[in-house]
């Protein structure tokens, strides 16, 4: 049975049991700072389990894309060397949100494994938490698993409830026992059943974990029964495929065999058991799926983890003999294997290939030199040695070797890296200069009251009641005049920062005082915090207030946000469908839009984008918003952003020819935007460009400033504004002509001075020594004069100097017959050190500079004596 069939049978089975099939979420968790990447099927349902989110279904099933590389869950160093470690894997899961519990979960699991997948019952062993008698009885008395194959696992990790069979989301919150199902590969493999001293062997392999969330753990560690217990299960597709396909290692399943052959093809290595080929087969999946989900290689965060994975793959290809980009050529093989289940692979294939090749080309420029340094250090160390941390940092900083790549290579030689010294070197280089924003505080305030109802789509003023107040992150009953704090209301017209749109500002007014709102942020998904300061009087919990949004600021934000949607559509039209939003910031002054594109935009492309957006504005069409089921929105072709987390019902915005999912605030007609102008375009990361633009009155002011500046230049040049460009080109041509003439004159002057200097050359032991200053000579003139003097003097050591703007330029030259004794680099440094400078170069020609021209005469006078000592 193929892996694709196993995946589909799993989903179909649970659909037949009343489960909603939910698409895999992005590998980039949305609004969850605790996760670097999605690493389990339950991630997208976390808020449902915590009670912050509700779904229209109580049963769900998924095949979830997962990555474990970087952060707490990091399998990277083991990938390729073990049978079951991967950076990317698929997690099959079924979930109950307060619906069925242990009995049905266990029955479903057993039915699927033994009746649908037809696994032999005597090959399956299960574990339960030692105190979970309910699960134990279900397995033994209802399912009929022999008691010797139902193993109780207690607290085996050093603390109460610290067990392989007790799952906790965190130190507090939902938790509960779990039951795990193991497959016995047979006596030909070493290892014992779970709970035995030999449990880490390869005989008994866990294939499915069923977590029963039945408690809420408080800060004191007390377990309180949940009113609606839930179920969260996870089964690795790769592991169960290995079992069903009759192989022992995951790399032997159909999914990996095709990729191993692709890796062998691109590296000319026929050994499909090679750990390096396994690394490539694994890493092409992680890299391609991360790129498809919008992650871009970079130097921090998710982008840096992706770059580390790519470079680890390149290094293993290099180890197999690859000396040029090869890794990207495996992408079509992956798309052929998994593109049907995950269409985003095919949709983004061109971008994935281009980005990988760009990363490969960059690393192949430095890997050879880096490997030479690394291997040279390894040769000096014996087994058990310690690799120098400063050298590891040099490899990282100069040659692009991530630390774990160096550690990976050293591990193959049984050598460790001095990570502490590496960290110290890194710390010395970095300057920590991150200043938190004045009001970027208290998004983690403790609040358990009612949610905030948002009315800001239709109203900019609304009567509300104060539910809670915070000062310095602590709940208070009252804020007094001059005090900064956060206000929570039951109703609000203020938009809380989200989706790139900044939070609203304005005021909360009551008979007791005025609170100036300077920012609005989400405390929780549906609770808004109004950040600001009490301007007059007081504000107290329970007060009724008039919440008033700053109308001018909101209107500017709406113009900029609506223009951003039109900009996104125009960029895709002009540059291509590979353009994807990577980030945005919409505030009253401007819009900033980051997008995927591998090269700078031309002036013509910028002009075309502006024209498209302004044409939409002139059309003055009405905008339309609708709340639709996400499946219907997808059918309508609404653009969705990678990494965003969407609910089952979404807000669809139609503006001009653009259709996107968006929860922000927008103009009612495109004409309300007024005017659109791009003010800047540039790169922010590899493969990511940034456009900044202004709208409305800000765009008009920008145009007027540009017109004023152009008028000033036209006046200076004494031409009409329309003729400025041609006149500037003519002036530049004239400047270049004059510069050439000046250089020629300087050369003639220097040459003449050089001829005059010949008589000043001193004869020392048969060689001529000359040290002199040439007035008004630039570097080129000095070099030309040096060549002529060396040619005429035949055997000589010469230093020429020139002074301009308080700085000294030095050139030293030595004829070939003297370089064995007199080095030009040493000679030029002799003089440079005396005038506050330094330099270097070849034995026959060297250059330096200095900042103390007053010391130049004495420095030049020292040349003859120094040369005599060398001869």
UniProtKB/Swiss-Prot annotation:
Known Pfam families for this protein?
DHHA1, tRNA-synt_2c, tRNA_SAD
| Cofactor binding mode and count | Binds 1 zinc ion per subunit.
InterPro entries (UniProt xref)? aa-tRNA-synth_II/BPL/LPL (IPR045864), Ala-tRNA-lgiase_IIc (IPR002318), Ala-tRNA-ligase_IIc_anticod-bd (IPR018162), Ala-tRNA-synth_IIc_core (IPR018165), Ala-tRNA-synth_IIc_N (IPR018164), Ala-tRNA_ligase (IPR050058), Ala_tRNA_ligase_euk/bac (IPR023033), DHHA1_dom (IPR003156)
In the Enzyme Commission scheme, what number(s) does this protein have?
Answer: 6.1.1.7
Per UniProt, Zn(2+) binds at 561, 565, 662, 666
* Comment on protein domains: Consists of three domains; the N-terminal catalytic domain, the editing domain and the C-terminal C-Ala domain. The editing domain removes incorrectly charged amino acids, while the C-Ala domain, along with tRNA(Ala), serves as a bridge to cooperatively bring together the editing and aminoacylation centers thus stimulating deacylation of misacylated tRNAs.
Q: List where in the cell it is found.
A: Cytoplasm
Under HAMAP family, the record lists: Ala_tRNA_synth_B
Family per similarity comment: Belongs to the class-II aminoacyl-tRNA synthetase family.
Spell out the SUPFAM superfamilies in the cross-references: Class II aaRS and biotin synthetases, Putative anticodon-binding domain of alanyl-tRNA synthetase (AlaRS), ThrRS/AlaRS common domain, Translation proteins
Keywords, A to Z, come to:
Aminoacyl-tRNA synthetase, ATP-binding, Cytoplasm, Ligase, Metal-binding, Nucleotide-binding, Protein biosynthesis, RNA-binding, tRNA-binding, Zinc
The protein's name: Alanine--tRNA ligase
Q: Does the keyword Nucleus apply?
A: no
Q: Which GO terms describe its cellular component?
A: cytosol
Q: Which cofactor does it need?
A: Zn(2+)
Which cysteine pairs are covalently linked by disulfides here? Answer: none
* One GO term (biological process): alanyl-tRNA aminoacylation
The reply on keyword Nucleus is: no
Origin superkingdom: Bacteria
């Amino acid at each position: 049975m193929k892996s694709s069939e196993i995946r589909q049978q799993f989903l179909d089975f649970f659909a037949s049991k009343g489960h909603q099939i939910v698409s895999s979420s992005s590998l980039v968790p949305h609004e969850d700072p605790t996760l670097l990447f999605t690493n389990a099927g339950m991630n997208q349902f976390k808020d449902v389990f915590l009670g912050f989110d509700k779904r229209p279904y109580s049963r769900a099933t998924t095949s979830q894309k997962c990555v474990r590389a970087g952060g707490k869950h990091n399998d990277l160093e083991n990938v390729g060397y073990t049978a079951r470690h991967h950076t990317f894997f698929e997690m099959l899961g079924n979930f109950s949100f307060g619906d069925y519990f242990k009995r049905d979960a266990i029955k479903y699991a057993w039915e699927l494994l033994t009746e649908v997948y037809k696994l032999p019952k005597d090959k399956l062993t299960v574990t339960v938490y030692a105190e979970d008698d309910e699960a134990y009885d279900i397995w033994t008395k209802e399912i009929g698993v022999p008691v010797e194959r139902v193993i109780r696992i207690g607290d085996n990790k050093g603390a109460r409830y610290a067990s392989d069979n007790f799952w906790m989301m965190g130190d507090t919150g939902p938790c509960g026992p779990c039951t795990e199902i193991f497959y016995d590969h047979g006596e030909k493999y070493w290892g014992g059943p779970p709970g035995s001293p030999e449990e880490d062997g390869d005989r008994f392999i866990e294939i499915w974990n069923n977590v029963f969330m039945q408690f809420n753990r408080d800060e004191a560690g007390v377990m309180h029964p949940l009113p609606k217990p839930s179920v969260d299960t996870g089964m690795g597709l790769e592991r169960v495929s290995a079992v069903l396909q009759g192989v022992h290692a995951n790399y032997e399943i159909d999914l990996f065999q095709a990729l191993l052959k692709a890796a062998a093809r691109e590296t000319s290595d026929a050994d499909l058991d090679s750990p390096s080929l396994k690394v490539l087969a694994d890493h092409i999946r992680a890299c391609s799926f991360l790129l498809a989900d919008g992650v871009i290689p970079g130097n921090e965060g998710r982008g840096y983890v992706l770059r580390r994975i790519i470079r680890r793959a390149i290094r293993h290809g290099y180890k197999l003999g690859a000396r040029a980009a090869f890794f990207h050529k495996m992408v079509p093989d992956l798309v052929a294997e998994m593109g049907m289940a995950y269409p985003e692979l095919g949709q983004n294939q061109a971008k994935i290939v281009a980005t990988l090749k760009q990363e490969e080309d960059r690393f192949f420029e430095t890997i050879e030199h880096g490997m030479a340094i690394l291997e040279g250090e390894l040769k000096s160390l014996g087994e058990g040695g310690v690799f120098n941390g400063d050298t590891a940092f040099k490899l990282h900083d100069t040659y692009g070797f991530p630390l774990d790549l160096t550690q990976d290579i050293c591990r193959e030689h049984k050598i460790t890296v001095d990570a502490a010294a590496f960290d110290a070197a890194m710390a010395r280089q970095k300057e920590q200069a991150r200043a938190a924003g004045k009001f970027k505080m208290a998004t983690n305030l403790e609040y358990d009251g009612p949610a905030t109802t948002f009315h800001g789509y239709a109203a900019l003023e609304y009567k509300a009641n104060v539910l809670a107040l915070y000062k310095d992150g602590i709940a208070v009953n009252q804020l007094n005049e001059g005090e900064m704090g956060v206000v929570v209301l039951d109703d609000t017209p203020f938009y809380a920062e989200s989706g790139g749109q900044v939070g609203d500002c304005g005021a909360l007014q009551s008979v007791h005082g005025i609170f100036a709102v300077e920012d609005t942020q989400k405390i929780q998904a549906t609770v808004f915090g109004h950040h600001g300061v009490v301007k007059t009087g007081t504000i107290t919990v329970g007060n009724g207030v008039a919440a008033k949004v700053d109308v001018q600021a909101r209107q500017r934000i709406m113009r900029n946000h609506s223009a951003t949607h039109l900009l996104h559509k125009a960029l895709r039209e002009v540059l291509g469908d590979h353009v994807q939003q990577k980030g945005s910031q919409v505030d009253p002054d401007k819009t900033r839009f980051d997008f995927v594109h591998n090269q700078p935009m031309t002036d013509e492309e910028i002009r075309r984008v502006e024209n498209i957006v302004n044409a939409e504005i002139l059309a003055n069409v009405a905008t339309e918003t609708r709340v639709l089921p996400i499946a219907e929105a997808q059918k309508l072709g609404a653009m969705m952003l990678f990494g965003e987390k969407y609910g089952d019902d979404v807000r669809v915005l139609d503006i001009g020819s653009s259709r996107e999912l968006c929860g922000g605030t927008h103009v009612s007609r495109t004409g309300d935007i007024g005017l659109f102008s791009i003010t800047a375009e540039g790169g922010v990361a590899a493969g990511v460009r940034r456009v900044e633009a202004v709208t409305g009155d800000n765009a008009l002011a920008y145009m007027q400033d540009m017109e004023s500046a152009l008028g000033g230049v036209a006046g200076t040049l004494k031409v009409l504004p329309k003729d400025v460009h041609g006149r500037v080109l003519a002036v530049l041509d004239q400047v270049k002509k004059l510069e050439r003439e000046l250089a020629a004159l300087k050369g003639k002057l220097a040459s003449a001075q050089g001829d005059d200097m010949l008589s000043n050359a001193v004869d020392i032991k048969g060689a001529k020594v000359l040290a002199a200053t040439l007035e008004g000579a630039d570097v080129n003139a000095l070099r030309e004069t040096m060549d002529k003097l060396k040619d005429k003097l035949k055997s000589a050591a010469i230093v020429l100097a020139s002074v301009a703007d308080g700085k000294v330029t030095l050139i030293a030259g030595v004829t070939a017959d003297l370089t064995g004794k007199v080095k030009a680099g040493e000679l030029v440094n002799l003089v440079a050190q005396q005038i506050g400078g330094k330099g270097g170069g070849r034995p026959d020609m060297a250059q330096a500079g200095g900042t103390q021209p007053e010391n130049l005469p004495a420095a030049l006078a020292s040349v003859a004596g120094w040369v005599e000592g060398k001869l």
